[in-house]
Amino acid sequence: MSEQKLSDNERLKAESNFLRGTIELDLKNDLTGGFTGDNFQLIRLHGMYQQDDRDIRAERAQQKLEPLHNVMLRARMPGGIITPEQWLGIDKFAHDHTMYGSIRLTTRQTFQFHGVLKPNIKMMHQTLNKYGIDSIATAGDVNRNVLCTSNPVESELHQEAYEWAKKISEHLLPKTRAYAEIWLDGEKLGPDEEPILGSTYLPRKFKTTVVIPPHNDIDVHANDLNFVAIAEDGKLVGFNVLVGGGLAMTHGNKETFPRKADDFGFIRKEDTLKFAEAVVTTQRDWGNRVNRQNAKTKYTLERVGVDAFKAEVEKRTGIKFEESRPYVFTSRGDRFGWVEGIDGKQHLTLFIENGRILDFPGKPLKTGLAEIAKIHKGDFRMTANQNLIIAGVPKKDKAKIEKIARAHGLIDDAITEQRKNSMACVALPTCPLAMAEAERFLPAFTTQIEAVMAKHGLADDHVIFRVTGCPNGCGRAMLAEIGLVGKAMDRYNFYIGGNREGTRIPRQYRENITSAEILKEIDALLGRWAKERNENEGFGDFVIRAGIVKPVVDSAKDFYAA
């Protein structure tokens, strides 16, 4: 690969002085609300994306104004656990210093601030730091926020899995002091080293999870590296290691495709960090730094072969993978309402549509959560399905917390199973990559699907339905039973045939069709499912069995097959 010209991102990282660039100078430049040159990309490795409000972009251009530049920040919260004190801190910042006033829970099991203007950026990082939160490496060519199954019931096993998620996150973090120097006025302490990530970091983004079967809420096949918890007598003994999943693709480029992760085998829990490091450094050294569209771990595995990659990981750790231990996934959705943990503590899972926490007319969700945070003695847990768990509630506080939640629209008994199993990425107006609506499209379209479900006698059932505004895959549509991927305004590619467990990639059924056309297709398909399904057969399994689409078995070979 060395004879070929490296992608420009490789130059940018190499010249960045360990991610510093000239960000500090840019912060002082008040001629533009944005970041210039390389800094536009470099801020991603500090957890931010430069965006603008696309709803008013044309209007501002007419007024000879630049786009309304702002940043989106994604916090680093391994396992998604946040204390009530931290919650009140981010609630206040979102209200006082963001354009939209909201907290957005994301599929990366963390929160995002949208619409932070340049004069507030440094203060934002300092505010987060005051509450023990940072945004290091939540974007860019690094290991991103580490996910962990939200399972408050099995409290002991979950706690240990969560501790490993935190340890993995810390171990794989960039070691540069650039973040502390720029945002927290940290001391400049001499030369930096990056023993794991290297001076040019990874070829592309890298996503890691810790998952506790039978619950696949974090969608293992969407991630580069997964540690599947294996327990004996309720105690964690180790992990099966799954490598090379990922959902992003590029419209029109058949060299890009979603891919499921491969099971490399079982490891003892004490070897977890060694294996995490070995997988990351193998991808660091073997990944494609010429073509970013083929730079992720999934493409490295396709190019060099699973066996060669696995052997290199074993060589770097000095430990052989053991044979995989058996496990099964049975579900992905969150368990809404109250559940009791084995420790007797109560846990309340709240459905937050699209993860958008804001005071809506008649549903002051943001105020309600702040009121709960003021009295709650446990913690909050963000889920990878964009919902929120009020965890560790003592029995005596249960009624009080439920009363606040109901008064603020945080509990709604009328929400259907279909709505609970529908999800979208942010898309317009803030995401610069969005080709179509997703978050703003989902609620009303889900209402239309609910009507179709009721018409066919399926009102109590559900289909895993997901929408992404572009093919990058943040909403994980490529693991849905019905997935829509944006192509243009009100036009989507329409995929069917994933399964409820999240272990099969769907296939394209129709290309570039409108939402009205999609609804007609869904009506016909759900009608057949209602009449012809086997007992308890999910929609995705039905469309495969009925021959409506062929299953995607090996996506590198058959994802684009007719």
Swiss-Prot record:
<dbReference type="InterPro" id="IPR036136">
    <property type="entry name" value="Nit/Sulf_reduc_fer-like_dom_sf"/>
</dbReference>
<dbReference type="InterPro" id="IPR006066">
    <property type="entry name" value="NO2/SO3_Rdtase_FeS/sirohaem_BS"/>
</dbReference>
<keyword id="KW-0411">Iron-sulfur</keyword>
<dbReference type="GO" id="GO:0009337">
    <property type="term" value="C:sulfite reductase complex (NADPH)"/>
</dbReference>
<comment type="subunit">
    <text>Alpha(8)-beta(8). The alpha component is a flavoprotein, the beta component is a hemoprotein.</text>
</comment>
<keyword id="KW-0349">Heme</keyword>
<dbReference type="GO" id="GO:0019344">
    <property type="term" value="P:cysteine biosynthetic process"/>
</dbReference>
<dbReference type="InterPro" id="IPR011786">
    <property type="entry name" value="CysI"/>
</dbReference>
<feature type="binding site">
    <location>
        <position position="431"/>
    </location>
    <ligand>
        <name>[4Fe-4S] cluster</name>
    </ligand>
</feature>
<keyword id="KW-0479">Metal-binding</keyword>
<dbReference type="Pfam" id="PF03460">
    <property type="entry name" value="NIR_SIR_ferr"/>
</dbReference>
<keyword id="KW-0198">Cysteine biosynthesis</keyword>
<keyword id="KW-0560">Oxidoreductase</keyword>
<dbReference type="InterPro" id="IPR045169">
    <property type="entry name" value="NO2/SO3_Rdtase_4Fe4S_prot"/>
</dbReference>
<feature type="binding site">
    <location>
        <position position="425"/>
    </location>
    <ligand>
        <name>[4Fe-4S] cluster</name>
    </ligand>
</feature>
<keyword id="KW-0004">4Fe-4S</keyword>
<dbReference type="GO" id="GO:0004783">
    <property type="term" value="F:sulfite reductase (NADPH) activity"/>
</dbReference>
<dbReference type="GO" id="GO:0051539">
    <property type="term" value="F:4 iron, 4 sulfur cluster binding"/>
</dbReference>
<feature type="binding site">
    <location>
        <position position="470"/>
    </location>
    <ligand>
        <name>[4Fe-4S] cluster</name>
    </ligand>
</feature>
<dbReference type="GO" id="GO:0050311">
    <property type="term" value="F:sulfite reductase (ferredoxin) activity"/>
</dbReference>
<comment type="function">
    <text>Component of the sulfite reductase complex that catalyzes the 6-electron reduction of sulfite to sulfide. This is one of several activities required for the biosynthesis of L-cysteine from sulfate.</text>
</comment>
<dbReference type="GO" id="GO:0000103">
    <property type="term" value="P:sulfate assimilation"/>
</dbReference>
<dbReference type="InterPro" id="IPR006067">
    <property type="entry name" value="NO2/SO3_Rdtase_4Fe4S_dom"/>
</dbReference>
<feature type="binding site" description="axial binding residue">
    <location>
        <position position="474"/>
    </location>
    <ligand>
        <name>siroheme</name>
    </ligand>
</feature>
<dbReference type="InterPro" id="IPR045854">
    <property type="entry name" value="NO2/SO3_Rdtase_4Fe4S_sf"/>
</dbReference>
<dbReference type="GO" id="GO:0046872">
    <property type="term" value="F:metal ion binding"/>
</dbReference>
<keyword id="KW-0521">NADP</keyword>
<dbReference type="GO" id="GO:0020037">
    <property type="term" value="F:heme binding"/>
</dbReference>
<dbReference type="Pfam" id="PF01077">
    <property type="entry name" value="NIR_SIR"/>
</dbReference>
<feature type="binding site">
    <location>
        <position position="474"/>
    </location>
    <ligand>
        <name>[4Fe-4S] cluster</name>
    </ligand>
</feature>
<comment type="pathway">
    <text>Sulfur metabolism; hydrogen sulfide biosynthesis; hydrogen sulfide from sulfite (NADPH route): step 1/1.</text>
</comment>
<dbReference type="GO" id="GO:0050661">
    <property type="term" value="F:NADP binding"/>
</dbReference>
<keyword id="KW-0408">Iron</keyword>
<protein>
    <recommendedName>
        <fullName>Sulfite reductase [NADPH] hemoprotein beta-component</fullName>
        <ecNumber>1.8.1.2</ecNumber>
    </recommendedName>
</protein>
<keyword id="KW-0028">Amino-acid biosynthesis</keyword>
<comment type="similarity">
    <text>Belongs to the nitrite and sulfite reductase 4Fe-4S domain family.</text>
</comment>
<dbReference type="GO" id="GO:0070814">
    <property type="term" value="P:hydrogen sulfide biosynthetic process"/>
</dbReference>
<dbReference type="InterPro" id="IPR005117">
    <property type="entry name" value="NiRdtase/SiRdtase_haem-b_fer"/>
</dbReference>
